[in-house]
Amino acid sequence: MRPFFCAAFGAPSCMRAANALSGGMDYPDLSLEEAAQARGYTRIAGVDEVGRGPLAGPVTAAAVVLDLADLPEGLNDSKKLTPRRRAALEPEIMARASYAVAHASVEEIDHHNILRASHLAMERAVAALDPQPDYLLIDGNLIPRALHIPAEAVVKGDGRSLSIAAASILAKEARDRIMVDLAQQFPGYGWERNAGYPSKQHRDALIKIGVTPHHRRSFKPVHKILYQE
């Protein structure tokens, strides 16, 4: 059920009303943000990343501080939105929120590991926010070690917090654009459709065409092909 009645309820209450009618399972809300506000925090950022599973391309993170009184309608975990809806929400978030997007490169993924690279991207996104937040809601079960702002890790946070959901949308849209651009430079892998994830087309192209500079050599399917060569 899509929360179409936001205007009637008012932005801060919209998602809670939708959750109540849908059994409380379908949409993120402002519960975590409001709990942080109750503890005295005023500038709360949601942080999320995308691109941990692909065989190619960077990992991308976004940090978003929402105006809790002026929320875009229909915010949800980016994975639960259609590409068209994500694309429509991106400019709405950018117009109404403070945000930053950052990346960790394929080289950094291979040098460190995908978890550390994901945290690097998160750290960079948070550092780029101006003004800085005073509290962070971070998707996942770990807090990046270089973040020195009070924070909490939120498992499946993009389905629980509207701020994290907004970050997931910006990160997804930004990374998808990168992969579309790379697909034009390196045709045949289907990156414009699979975003670097190991689809059949991508795996077949790795065997037939080979490994590009944008592939993650530390990932087993890529490493295996390089080793065979």
Swiss-Prot record:
Positions of a divalent metal cation binding: D48, E49, D139
EC number(s) given by UniProt: 3.1.26.4
UniProt-listed Gene3D superfamilies: Ribonuclease H-like superfamily/Ribonuclease H
Pfam families, per database record: RNase_HII (PF01351)
Function recorded in the entry: Endonuclease that specifically degrades the RNA of RNA-DNA hybrids.
Family membership noted in the UniProt record: Belongs to the RNase HII family.
UniProt protein name: Ribonuclease HII
Organism, as annotated: Ruegeria sp. (strain TM1040)
Origin organism lineage: Bacteria, Pseudomonadati, Pseudomonadota, Alphaproteobacteria, Rhodobacterales
Gene (name only): rnhB
